[in-house]
């Protein structure tokens, strides 16, 4: 699911505001079966095959897992444009952006399962196979200055200051 909204407002002549909000989510579920196969001779006698690529019944397994990722985005910026004396065209823009992501995963596994039943069943142990969770965020401040003289000479200056949760606190913020 994805949802995005944009708000644009003309505050004054030449001064505009734009804000955006966004959300997206992704869900995934997985069922995995690793089942044993019984091998027989033509006369119906079971074959005990140690070299089989399929597990013995007690080593068969069924794993059920699910994962979810949520992403949030918000940004806002102001833009100012003005032409002075029909020669000096100036544009200023400044803003902020925030991105946040969260991930959740869990998996459960059952051993020694019955092949005919597709659920977490079994005579053996049922246990948590894996649990994982993480979050990350980025906050950014940015700006731009454009100057244009009679559409002949142009200068542009950009700056951006970012902070990320992926880095250690002493390295978290940088240009």
Predicted regions and their residues:
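Secondary-structure transition into beta-strands, especially the periplasmic turns and strand N-termini
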Residues: 5-23, 80-94, 147-155, 166-169
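Transmembrane beta-strands of outer-membrane beta-barrel pores
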Residues: 23-29, 82, 96-104, 159-165
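Outer-membrane beta-barrel transmembrane domain signature of Gram-negative proteins
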Residues: 35, 39, 45-152
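Ordered, soluble secondary-structure elements with a strong preference for glycine-centered loop motifs
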Residues: 68, 169-170
């Amino acid at each position: 699911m994805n949802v995005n909204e944009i708000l644009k407002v003309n505050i004054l002549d030449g001064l505009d505001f734009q804000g955006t909000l966004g959300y997206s989510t992704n869900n995934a579920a997985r069922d995995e079966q690793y089942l044993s196969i019984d091998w027989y001779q033509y006369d119906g006698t079971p074959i005990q095959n140690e070299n089989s690529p399929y597990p013995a019944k007690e080593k068969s397994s069924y794993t059920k897992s699910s994962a979810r990722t949520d992403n949030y985005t918000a940004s806002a910026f102001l833009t100012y444009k003005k032409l002075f004396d029909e020669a000096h065209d100036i544009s200023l823009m400044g803003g902020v952006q925030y991105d946040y992501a969260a991930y959740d995963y869990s998996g459960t596994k059952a051993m020694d399962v019955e092949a005919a039943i597709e659920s977490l069943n079994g005579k053996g142990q049922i246990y948590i196979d894996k649990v994982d969770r993480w979050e990350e965020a980025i906050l950014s401040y940015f700006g731009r200055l454009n100057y244009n003289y009679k559409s002949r000479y142009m200068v542009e200056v950009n700056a951006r200051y970012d902070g990320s949760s992926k880095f250690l606190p002493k390295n978290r913020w940088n240009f």
